[in-house]
Structure formats: structure tokens, C-alpha cells
């Protein structure tokens, strides 16, 4: 009995050669619509789908393969006599191979001019149905959704006249993943259209971007997946211009770096980062000076660190960066001379280019945190804060220089691991206490790091001070201005201590925990 294949693809890459080889192996080919036209034009004889169903395509192609003659031919178990008899009684011929890929829904909704009606029309119905039927019956039917599998299937058919069960099972698994991802994109699109913020089912889909050598530690396996609907301002979309492949820890650090730099749009700014904590932030009227400040903030910790700049890297800045051992540099662009300088004898230095003009769109994405047995979902900590809404709670008002420095410090503290304390002036960080289990410990670490640069410095805390002992430490160090959320039941104790020492203190009313 001649074996039959059903071919209906939107991605026609490789399909002509594949179909010709099938014909050479003695297969009959059923086809539909544009695929049939393409095969016929290439000289590949095909059977029209309506010759199989006895029913014409209708409703602009919405109904053409949803028919018992198709699904019966796919679902009939070859090892069950009653199935074969039912097929015979109803003149259903068996289909042994299905090659289908789906309407380009993803590509359609990514078009800037897409309309709702166009998106709906690109939801495939018949394709997923055929794929599911064939994949369910993979004991007998080979199903192909990816052109990358054409060669394997043809090779096995040529060698043995059929594919192996292991191949059919693997291809079926790929099909179910493909359909699930396709449906997840449709669900994501419609969920966004109706503005559903808390869906009862969360369906998200990601594509494998990079198989990694290992994870956070060598004993951990890891891979990097990219959102199926890409985010332009993201590590997944960054263009790598030089260097080794990014590691698991590199990717997490870069993600933290490009989040931090989003908050410093107004002036040229450089952020140096280690282990997802900023170790130096500098801003100035030009990017070279901003680099100087970021480097001077902590010339020890920057060694082996990540650096992100929010302006084009010029030659002067590149010359200063080149002697420093850095893991990664990220910027919106690089001058030709700067790139030549940075890559000179630095084949391992990872240099990334990222479209900073797409930052705003990245801020609306949800954050996902895996826990054992579940997933936490929250929006990003990107609340718009207006300094005019902040409250000076002490007798002394901040000076103009202090006010500028406090605003700078408040931007920086958002990205320090809690309990987080940062000491800055109006253009660079000076000391940082991160990740301590008590706040006064973070205060002491930040003061120790900044001890030679405390004149005119200010201090920011990511959460309220629970006790006045923190204020006492700050005052003893000579810091004269503090910014914090407030909200402790002992706020008045802290205010009294600040007044006693002549400090100025601002309450923002917004906490910035970062675990």
C-alpha cells in the first residue's frame, strides 16, 4: 500500500526538496492552499485536500482540514482491528506522515501595524488539530513541525522505509511543545487585550537562547531562555561585539546593570557592578568623567566587574577602561576607535550593544521569581517618584547641594541588596553596605568604605531605620543628610536623634527592598 503524507506549511523553507525526496521514495502527498501551489509549481505531484475530504475549502480557508477523512486517517491505530475496519467502512485512507507548521501568529502581532482582526485571522485552527492528532498517534504516524528535522526523517525513510519509534516519540514531544507555546502566545495576546492583570492560569512561553556550560556554580546545569515575544531592551536582545560566550552569572549581572542605568537617563552615567550590586556609580556632563567617578568610587571592587554606560563610548573613555580587567561592558553604541581600543589584546572581554531608546517598554514587564513548587509574580520597582512629594521631617532643610545628592543617592539605593545603605555625594557613590541582616551593620560597612570622603556626603537607606542607633552612627561619622522611606513605629526617635545632631532627613514614603 502506498504511504501518504500530508504537507501544509507556512514556512516553506526546504519543503520543495523534502517533498521531491518523498516522491522519489514512492509516497503520495496530500496538500493544501499555498503549499499545494508551491509544490505543483515545482513539479511535485500532489493530491488536493478537497479530493480527500470530498468537501471544498470554505470561509476563506478557515475550514479545510477539519474532517473525519483527515483526522480518521491520522488517529486510526494500526494495531487495533476495529480502527482499521472503521476506516475501511468509511473509505478513510490512512495518513502516515504529517508535515505542518502554523500560521505566523507571533510574527503578525509583532508587526507595528497589526490590527486586532488581523491577529485573530492568524490564529491557526486546522494546523494544531492535525499536529495533535498525528502526535497522539505517534506509534504509527510521523509528525514534523520543524524544517530542521526534514533530513532525519528522510534519512530513516530511505534506510528502513519508516521512522523509528524513538524518532516519532521525540518529534511528537516537539510538536506538543510547539503547540503549547503557540497557544500560550495567543493567550498572552488576548490577556493583554482585555487587560487581565491576575489571570487564573499563567501561560508564558520562552525559546531556548543559549545552552550554558553550567549555572551559578559548576555543579549546576543551566540554560538561557528568551521571551517568545522579545524585549528590545534586555540582555536577551543585546548584540555581542566581542568576547566569550556569556555565563549564567554574567547574564544575571548584566540584567541588574541595565536595570540600574534606566534610572539615570538625564546625565551621562556609568555604573560598575559586582554580584548584582553596584560598586560604583558616577555621573557627569560627559561620559569620560562619569567613568572616572565610577572607577574612583571603588577601584578595588571594579576589578573583574561589569560596567554599563548610558552614552556612546568614545575613544578617550575606552583608553581609560582598557587597562582595567573587566568582564563585560554594555553601552548603547561605541565609536569605531573606541571599539578598536577595547578589543586590542582583549579577545575575552565581552562587549555588548543595547538600544537604550527602548528602556521604557522594558519597565512594564512582570518579574518572575521561582520558588520550590511555585512562581512569584510582581511588577517591577519602577514607581515614578517626585521629590516634591518627599517630606523633610527634621528642623533643618537640606541645602541645594544636599538635595541634589540625596536625589542621586535615592536612585542608587533601589539596586542595593537589602539591608541596603549607600553613601554618595552629588555625582558618585562613596560607600555601600549591602545584604546585611541588620541595618546598623550595613551603615557601619558603608561608613567604613567612605570614611575618607564623608565631607558633604549623604546617606540613603532602602527601608526605614528601626532604631535611632543608626542615626547616631551616621552623625558620628560626619554625614549630615539622610534619605529613607520612613514608616517605623520609632520614626520619631530617629527624627529626634537627627535634630539633636543638626542633620537633615527626608522621608520618601516609598520602600525599596531588594532580596
From Swiss-Prot:
One of its GO terms (biological process) is 'de novo' IMP biosynthetic process. It holds the Pfam family MGS. One of its GO terms (cellular component) is cytosol. The keyword Transferase applies. Its EC number is 2.1.2.3, 3.5.4.10. Residues 1-145 form the MGS-like domain. HAMAP family: PurH (MF_00139). The IMP cyclohydrolase activity resides in the N-terminal region. Belongs to the PurH family. This is Bifunctional purine biosynthesis protein PurH. It comes from Streptococcus pyogenes serotype M6 (strain ATCC BAA-946 / MGAS10394). The lineage of its organism: Bacteria, Bacillati, Bacillota, Bacilli, Lactobacillales.
Amino acid at each position: 500500500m502506498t504511504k501518504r503524507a500530508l504537507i501544509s506549511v507556512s514556512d516553506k523553507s526546504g519543503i520543495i526538496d523534502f517533498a521531491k525526496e518523498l516522491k522519489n521514495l514512492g509516497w503520495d502527498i496530500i496538500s493544501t492552499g499555498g503549499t499545494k501551489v508551491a509544490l505543483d509549481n515545482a513539479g511535485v505531484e500532489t493530491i488536493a485536500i478537497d479530493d480527500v475530504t470530498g468537501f471544498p475549502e470554505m470561509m476563506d480557508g478557515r475550514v479545510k482540514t477539519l474532517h473525519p477523512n483527515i483526522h480518521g486517517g491520522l488517529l486510526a491505530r494500526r494495531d487495533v482491528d476495529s480502527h482499521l475496519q472503521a476506516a475501511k467502512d468509511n473509505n478513510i485512507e490512512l495518513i502516515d506522515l504529517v508535515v505542518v507548521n502554523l500560521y505566523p501568529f507571533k510574527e503578525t502581532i509583532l508587526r507595528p501595524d497589526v490590527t486586532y482582526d488581523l491577529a485573530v485571522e492568524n490564529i491557526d485552527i486546522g494546523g494544531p488539530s492535525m499536529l495533535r492528532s498525528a502526535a497522539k498517534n505517534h506509534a504509527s504516524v510521523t509528525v514534523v513541525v520543524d524544517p530542521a528535522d526534514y533530513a532525519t526523517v528522510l534519512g530513516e525513510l530511505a534506510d528502513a522505509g519508516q521512522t523509528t519509534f524513538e524518532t516519532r516519540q521525540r518529534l511528537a514531544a516537539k510538536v506538543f511543545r510547539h503547540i503549547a507555546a503557540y497557544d500560550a502566545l495567543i493567550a498572552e495576546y488576548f490577556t493583554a487585550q482585555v487587560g487581565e492583570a491576575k489571570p487564573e492560569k499563567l501561560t508564558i512561553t520562552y525559546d531556548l537562547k543559549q545552552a550554558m556550560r553550567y549555572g551559578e556554580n559548576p555543579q549546576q546545569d543551566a540554560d538561557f531562555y528568551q521571551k517568545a515575544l522579545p524585549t528590545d531592551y534586555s540582555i536577551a536582545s543585546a548584540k555581542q561585539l566581542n568576547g566569550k560566550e556569556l555565563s549564567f552569572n554574567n547574564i544575571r549581572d548584566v540584567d541588574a546593570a541595565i536595570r540600574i542605568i534606566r534610572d539615570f537617563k538625564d546625565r551621562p552615567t556609568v555604573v560598575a557592578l559586582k554580584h548584582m550590586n553596584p560598586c560604583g556609580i558616577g555621573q557627569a556632563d560627559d561620559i569620560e568623567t562619569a567613568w572616572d567617578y565610577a572607577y574612583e568610587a571603588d577601584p578595588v571592587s571594579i576589578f573583574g566587574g561589569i560596567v554599563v554606560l548610558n552614552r556612546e563610548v568614545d575613544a578617550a573613555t575606552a583608553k581609560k577602561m582598557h587597562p582595567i580587567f573587566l568582564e563585560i561592558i554594555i553601552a548603547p553604541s561605541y565609536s569605531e576607535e573606541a571599539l578598536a581600543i577595547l578589543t586590542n589584546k582583549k579577545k575575552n572581554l565581552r562587549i555588548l550593544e543595547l538600544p537604550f531608546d527602548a528602556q521604557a517598554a522594558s519597565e512594564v514587564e512582570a518579574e518572575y521569581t521561582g520558588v520550590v513548587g511555585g512562581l512569584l509574580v510582581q511588577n517591577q520597582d519602577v514607581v515614578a517618584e517626585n521629590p516634591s512629594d518627599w517630606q523633610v521631617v527634621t528642623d533643618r532643610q537640606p541645602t541645594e547641594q544636599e538635595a541634589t545628592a540625596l536625589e542621586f543617592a535615592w536612585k542608587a539605593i533601589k539596586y542595593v541588596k537589602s539591608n541596603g545603605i549607600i553613601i554618595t555625594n552629588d555625582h558618585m557613590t562613596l560607600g555601600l553596605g549591602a545584604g546585611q541582616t541588620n541595618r546598623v551593620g550595613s551603615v557601619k560597612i558603608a561608613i567604613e568604605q567612605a570614611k575618607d570622603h564623608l565631607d558633604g556626603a549623604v546617606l540613603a537607606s532602602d527601608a526605614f531605620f528601626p532604631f535611632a542607633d543608626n542615626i547616631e552612627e551616621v552623625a558620628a561619622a560626619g554625614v549630615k543628610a539622610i534619605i529613607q522611606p520612613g514608616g517605623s513605629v520609632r520614626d520619631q526617635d530617629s527624627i529626634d536623634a537627627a535634630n539633636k545632631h543638626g542633620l537633615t532627613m527626608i522621608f520618601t514614603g516609598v520602600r525599596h527592598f531588594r532580596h
